[in-house]
Amino acid sequence: MSSEARSRSSVARSAHSLRLRPWHVRVLAVSVAVLLCTTGLPAYSVLTHEEIVDLVWTDQIGPLLLKRFPTLTEDQLKEAHAYAYGGAVIQDLGYYPFGSVEFSNLVHYVRSGDFVRELLAQSQDADEYAFALGALAHYASDISGHPAVNTAVALQYPKLRARYGNSVKYAEDHTAHLKTEFGFDMVQVAKNRYASQQYHDFIGFQVSKTLLERTFPIVYGIELKEILTHEDLAIGSYRFAVSRTIPEMTRVALRTHQKDMMKETPDFAKEKFLYRLKRSDYEKEWGKDYKKDGFKTRVFSILLRYMPKIGPFKALAFNNPTAQTEDLYFKSINTTVDQYRIYLKQVSASSLELVNTDFDTGKPAKAAEYSLADNTYAKLLSQLADHKFSLTSPKLRDNILGFYSDLSLPLQTKKDSAQWQSVLASLDQLKSTTPNASVEPAPSQPTPN
């Protein structure tokens, strides 16, 4: 009997022992379908983004909400917490089923700070405000998280380090990034360092569609529906993936890898993180264990033992972090929380300033420094030209012209001569076009509760 036949036989016996029924197969099929359509999750994974919100919820985010909306009830605060979770990973919406990678590329590489500031300015109620504050958490997370992951990938993969140096960016090896990020999540779950899945289920996960629709054309000069052509389906599948499929796959991976998880080692950065975690009071009420294995988890873990780690399953073949890379992770989390607290204080004082950062490098977005940024600017410019720059605001015009201020730079776009000629023609059109000042309205006023 071949090894492939033996694998199929083992899976069949294991599934039979668990009495796999038709409805179980359907549930598993839906989960696998979502996973198959997920194209990538750069920077911190979902659980880490949500944890950043949890670490500052009680002493900063909650009070900020009450400062602006003083009559909020406990139930309304809980609902706002769900929207903060949604905002904390909204920049990654395009990487989920039925989403648009173009959406995530724009908010990662083009006017990333302006996008978050405009979400805050346009928010009208507590849910929208919480959603915007969550998006600010993502901004803080990515500008410190990406450089840390870039370094960790280089440490975990010597061949990549030899090729790219001590920092391996997402565009240079997607798979290594996914494995590294997922490995960080697995270790934290294994050691009970995240708010429990029971707590996440209680809070929920929400997306402020109307706020996104108002904000996106102001920042990028095109309507959201042009980028997310199946907007409702994209948001719905995104919520399902974050609240159901990803936690399920986390439990599956944990079940299959837990014996190999690294042992604890003394470390100052880790202790600082754990101290902050203990100050959160979620553990008292909800327990610290990630949700226990259920039927689906047991079946999935059996199937995945024999499934080749290719395509969307590559991340499940992650390497456990080393003591050195886990230290990088903790330091980046601590830096993120410290910086996020500063941003929240600036929000409270109406003095928030955010640099338009390239999330993958953690540096200000500039031409010829990152291939994905170059390509994203070129595509946006082409789309704006197709619309005769009708929704192009003065700030957007200045941002694009600033990006292309030195045409002698070795931009990635120049590798395609036709695309580069299109960029040059569109730039000439933009320079001769009067921007639409009405696109940038005065910030919306809070809606009283």
What are these regions (language model features)?
Residues 235-245:
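Eukaryote-specific, cytoplasm-facing alpha-helical/coiled-coil scaffolding segments in long proteins
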Residues 26-38:
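Bacterial N-terminal signal peptides
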Residues 225-233:
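Ordered core of a single globular domain
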Residues 27, 247-255:
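Short, low-complexity Pro/Thr/Gly
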Residues 41-130, 143-225, 255-260, 271-449:
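N-terminal, motif-rich segments that launch catalysis or mediate targeting to/interaction with membranes
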Residues 135, 139-143:
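Catalytic glutamate of the conserved HExxH
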Residues 137, 250, 265-266:
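Mature extracellular/secreted ectodomains of secretory-pathway proteins
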Residues 1-22:
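N-terminal secretory signal peptides that target proteins for export/translocation
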